[in-house]
Swiss-Prot record:
Homodimer. Within each dimer, one monomer is responsible for RNA recognition and catalysis, while the other monomer binds to the replacement base PreQ1. The gene is tgt. Substrate binds at residues 90-94, 144, 188, 215. Zn(2+) binds at residues 303, 305, 308, 334. This is Queuine tRNA-ribosyltransferase. The lineage of its organism: Bacteria, Pseudomonadati, Pseudomonadota, Betaproteobacteria, Neisseriales. The active site is at residues 90, 265. HAMAP family: Q_tRNA_Tgt. NCBIfam families: Q_tRNA_tgt, tgt_general. Binds 1 zinc ion per subunit. It comes from the Bacteria. InterPro entries: ArchSynthase1/Queuine_TRR (IPR050076), TGT (IPR004803), TGT-like_sf (IPR036511), tRNA_ribo_trans-like (IPR002616). The keyword Transferase applies. One of its GO terms (cellular component) is cytosol. It comes from Laribacter hongkongensis (strain HLHK9).
């Protein structure tokens, strides 16, 4: 089930609600990534406290470990993981295509060797829909092919057209499995506007509950990513949620929302947290730097997260330098809270029809330095 309601716009920025089988989401929204069914260094209650409304699970990795038999025993990911709010799962395609020489792409699907034990496996649109039906994720993604950041037009066109054929097969299999959740199609076409338009038209003809923009933030220059976003964003259907996959930095999120994107996911806040790279409204803090060893201030004096309420930069510096797992946990709490607060601030700015002013203030603050 999916019901999307658009409440307000400010320029191209959109404020909406997305009703799913496991809850209602306020958009625009950021989805923390729980690759193996857990957001790294977080428990579900801590994740909830950051303001997270929905998380992402990885179809490829969950299929390999623990496997469908195990997750099926629990009736899906929600009871297995203890996260009872909505979950989106990707199709598994990106991970398979990242295997390089270990995989072979055909019209039928992708043959590959398991990176865990070397088993020969096959992922098709139908198999991806089967896996995601067992996972019982609230939002299911079609299987698509993601090209590298910059390829020639002919290569991008052939890949995009195969993704469209896979989209049709994904739609058919999703319906055959009587999956009660929502299915999103994925716009591909690399950096070429004509291919993106052809892809979007094909997906619209097939019929999906939401539309994702894929194939960005995969190695192309940032100005090119923003160009495609500015061209494609306003073309997306107004009555469906728009999802920008695998993006990104705080600046990327603001740029995405400015161009009509409603949903984002990225490993950046959690991965960077474990590496001591912390986001604040005043710019980024690399907590390993010696300048923070006796800094008594919190990361951000205006942040209300557990980490900023209780701990100093000096203590976080110490935890990172000594490799304490508590440091990774506290850093992750802060980064995810920062991302969720950023989304809440954008929702409020759209409601007040002041998003352009918010953008200016956001960039000015981030440039100031922490």
């Amino acid at each position: 089930m999916l019901e999307f309601t658009l409440h307000k716009t400010s320029g191209h920025a959109r404020r909406g609600t997305l009703r799913l089988n496991h809850g209602t989401i306020e958009t625009p929204v950021f989805m923390p990534v729980g690759t193996y069914g857990a957001v790294k260094a977080m428990t579900p209650d801590r994740l909830d406290e950051t303001g997270a409304q929905i998380i992402l699970g990885n179809t490829f990795h969950l299929w390999l470990r623990p496997g469908l038999d195990v997750i099926g025993t629990f009736g899906g990911l929600h009871d297995f993981t203890g996260w009872h709010k909505p979950i989106l799962t990707d199709s598994g395609g990106f991970q398979v295509f990242s295997l390089g020489d270990l995989r072979k792409i055909t019209e039928e699907g992708v043959h590959f060797q398991s990176p865990i034990n070397g088993d020969k496996l096959f992922l098709s649109p139908e198999k991806s829909m089967e896996i995601q039906t067992v996972l019982n994720s609230d939002i299911v993604m079609q299987l698509d092919e993601c090209t590298p950041g910059q390829v020639d037009h002919a290569t991008a066109k052939a890949s995009m057209q195969m993704s469209l054929r896979w989209a049709e097969r994904s739609r058919r299999a999703f319906d055959d499995y009587r999956n009660p959740n929502a299915l999103f199609g994925i716009v591909q076409g690399n950096l070429y506007l004509d291919l993106r338009e052809e892809s979007l038209k094909g997906l619209t003809d097939i019929g999906f509950d939401g539309i994702a923009v894929g194939g960005l933030s995969v190695g192309e220059p940032k100005p090119e990513m923003y160009r495609v976003l500015r061209e494609v964003g306003p073309m997306l259907p107004a009555d469906k949620p728009h999802y920008l996959m695998g993006v990104g930095t705080p600046e990327d999120l603001v740029e995405g929302v400015a161009n009509g994107i409603d949903m984002f996911d990225c490993v950046m806040p959690t991965r960077n947290a474990r590496n001591g790279w912390l986001f604040t409204r005043w710019g980024d803090v690399k907590i390993k730097n010696a300048r923070y060893k006796d800094d008594t201030r919190p990361l951000d004096e205006q942040c209300s997260c557990y980490t900023c309420r209780h701990f100093s930069r000096g203590y976080l510096h110490h935890l990172h330098r000594t490799g304490e797992i508590t440091g990774a946990m506290l850093n992750t709490v802060h980064n995810l809270h920062y991302y969720q607060e950023l989304m809440a601030d954008m929702r409020a700015a759209i409601e007040a029809d002041s998003f352009a002013g918010f953008q200016q203030e956001f960039h000015a603050q981030r440039a100031r330095g922490a």
